[in-house]
């Protein structure tokens, strides 16, 4: 026999699965810059390899970070555009780390090279995420740049070689699902 009363009791006063916790604030994925060295066909941002008016300066970014900390935001993912095109990216990351944020860098990976890998490692990002959209041909087609896959992969390998926690991000579409 099915007794609804026991189910109603459980719904009205459920058995806790663990101790009650106050969740931390939200994860903030912050598009610090619109400029990008790529023109990916699937990107939501209308980007180009040029500066755009109206972007926040370093001091303004720092003020926003103060506000985010006051709102108990625990995680900042620095994104764009391509955040490595921002001259103050390492200053921003350094301040965020000093403030106690978990700091991630979201990059297309093509600009991670010998000229900046030491600065990336020194910035002590908690995570560097590099987007790949498939294997070589598919990725380069999405990115509209021949050689983008090889450059991104080289950036991933440089990070790994210096002990930077790095990972691949893959957005599956009908055009690249077979590459997964």
Spans of model-derived segments:
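Conserved strand-turn element in the central/C-terminal portion of the radical SAM core barrel
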Residues: 102, 155-179
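Conserved alpha-helical substructure of the radical SAM core
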Residues: 2-127
């Amino acid at each position: 026999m099915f007794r609804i009363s026991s189910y109603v009791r459980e719904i009205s006063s459920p058995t806790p699965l663990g101790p009650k916790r106050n969740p931390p604030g939200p994860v903030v994925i912050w598009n610090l810059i619109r400029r990008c060295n790529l023109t990916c066909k699937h990107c939501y941002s209308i980007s180009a390899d040029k500066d755009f008016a109206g972007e926040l300066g370093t001091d303004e970014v720092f003020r926003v970070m103060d506000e985010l900390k006051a709102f108990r935001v625990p995680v900042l993912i620095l994104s764009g555009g391509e955040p490595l095109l921002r001259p103050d990216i390492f200053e921003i990351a350094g301040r965020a780390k000093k403030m106690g944020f978990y700091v991630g860098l979201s990059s297309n990976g093509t600009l991670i090279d010998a000229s900046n890998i030491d600065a990336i490692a020194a910035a002590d990002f908690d995570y560097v995420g590099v987007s790949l959209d498939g294997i070589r041909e598919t990725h380069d087609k999405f990115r509209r740049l021949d050689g983008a896959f090889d450059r991104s992969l080289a950036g991933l390998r440089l990070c790994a070689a210096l002990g930077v926690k790095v990972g691949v991000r893959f957005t599956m579409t009908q055009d690249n699902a077979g590459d997964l």
